[in-house]
Each structure stands twice: as structure tokens, then as C-alpha cells.
Design a protein with these regions (language model features):
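Juxtamembrane membrane-interface segments at transmembrane alpha-helix termini
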Residues: 41-52, 61-67, 126-134, 194
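Hydrophobic alpha-helical transmembrane segments of polytopic membrane proteins
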Residues: 193-216
Length: 216
């Protein structure tokens, strides 16, 4: 969190704009800079950086769980059979329900919010990774086998590159769900914009709620 909150706001804006420029071009960079300057102007910079930090860490953890598990499920029907009902269960539970076991196990604070966010976001990453690996043309895989490629090499050089669009769609879903859940996680003590949103709801503070919602 201190990585985002300690430096001056203009340093963070420049870094994020540069990353956006390298990733997608100048339009995204300008849009990111304008959006962050708007956050500064409404006085929500620290809360936004806290929410961003929570979201980034949750996304990284969720991806580190989802992608390997999705690959394993794609390569083993037994694992897929075991994992599928668990993912169904995770995706059918309301977002607020994730907070209950997190509070029971970890108390109130950042950790239960992080755990709840990861659990809420991980399922689509697993599903779309498995779908992408299973969707690779079987003939391409058989051609790799015919040339003597090992299973690991087939995975790295054939299946993962061809499945990347589906995997990235899963990563996109993980990011969106993590962002939405990181706001709800403020109900159990996680810092960030969610605290202002909850206060706005409890006090009917329309202006505060609008500012926090705009920052999100």
C-alpha cells in the first residue's frame, strides 16, 4: 500500500500513464492521467490508492491460483470433475457471504477483505483458463507429439499461446470482480473507497457517495 500512498500523486500518475502508453497507446495514457487527476481534484486520492493496492494484490494472488489450477483441470479430467462444483458454489454465493468465513478465520481488517476478494474473483480465471486449454485444436497437439515434444513443451509452446485470448479474458474478469469486491470488503475493515461508500449509504450523504463512486 505504501508504494502507492508514499510518493507524490504526480509520480504515480506519470508511472500509470507510462504503463498505459506502453500497453495500449497514448489514448489510454491520456485517459488514465485525466481520470487520476479527477480523483485528486475530488480529494479521494489516498482512498483510491488504498483500493488500488488491495485490488492489485488480490488480482495477483487470484491469477497465481487460477491459471495453474485451470491448466491442471484442463489436463486432468479428475481434477476438472472435482473443481467444477467448487467453482459453481463460489460463483453462486452472494458477494457479502464471502465476508462471513473471512471474519471468522481472520477477524476484522485488511486480511479478511483480501481473502474474500480472492475467493470471489478466482472462479472465472480457472474456468476460462481450462476452457482455453481444452479449446486448442487436438490435431495441433498431436502434431507436437508426433515431433517428439514433451508434454511441458507442448503446454508452453502450443497450448498456452493458442489459449491466451481465453486466459486473458479470464484475467479481465478477475480484475473486474476484484475491484467490485474490494469495495464491499470495506465492510470488514479493508481500507479504501468502500469505507466512504458505506458511510454515504448509512448517512445518506449523496455528495460523498458520488465522489467515492466516481473514483471507483
Amino acid at each position: 500500500e505504501w508504494i502507492f500512498t508514499a510518493p507524490p500523486f504526480w509520480v504515480i500518475i506519470i508511472v500509470i500513464a507510462a504503463i498505459a502508453w506502453l500497453a495500449k497507446g497514448w489514448k489510454l495514457a491520456i485517459g488514465s492521467a485525466i481520470g487520476l487527476l479527477l480523483v485528486v481534484s475530488i480529494g479521494q486520492w489516498n482512498n483510491t490508492m488504498q483500493t488500488l493496492a488491495l485490488t492489485i494484490v488480490a488480482v495477483i494472488i487470484a491469477i497465481l491460483i487460477a491459471v495453474p489450477l485451470g491448466i491442471w483441470a484442463a489436463r486432468s479430467q479428475t481434477v476438472s470433475t472435482v473443481v467444477r462444483p467448487i467453482l459453481d458454489f463460489l460463483q453462486t454465493m452472494p458477494a457479502f457471504v464471502y465476508l462471513i468465513p473471512a471474519i471468522f478465520l481472520f477477524g476484522v481488517g485488511v486480511v479478511p477483505g483480501m481473502v474474500a476478494t480472492v475467493l470471489f474473483a478466482v472462479a472465472p480465471g480457472v474456468r476460462l483458463t481450462e476452457l482455453g486449454i481444452r479449446g486448442v485444436d487436438r490435431e495441433v497437439v498431436e502434431a507436437g507429439n508426433a515431433f517428439g515434444a514433451t508434454p511441458g513443451r507442448i503446454l508452453r509452446q502450443i497450448q498456452l499461446p493458442l489459449a491466451m485470448p481465453s486466459i486473458m479474458a479470464g484475467v479481465n474478469q478477475v480484475i473486474m470482480l476484484s475491484l467490485s469486491m474490494s469495495v464491499i470488503a470495506s465492510m470488514v475493515g479493508a481500507p479504501g473507497l468502500g469505507k466512504d461508500i458505506i458511510q454515504a449509504l448509512s448517512r445518506t450523504a449523496i455528495a460523498l457517495g458520488f465522489e467515492a463512486g466516481l473514483a471507483v
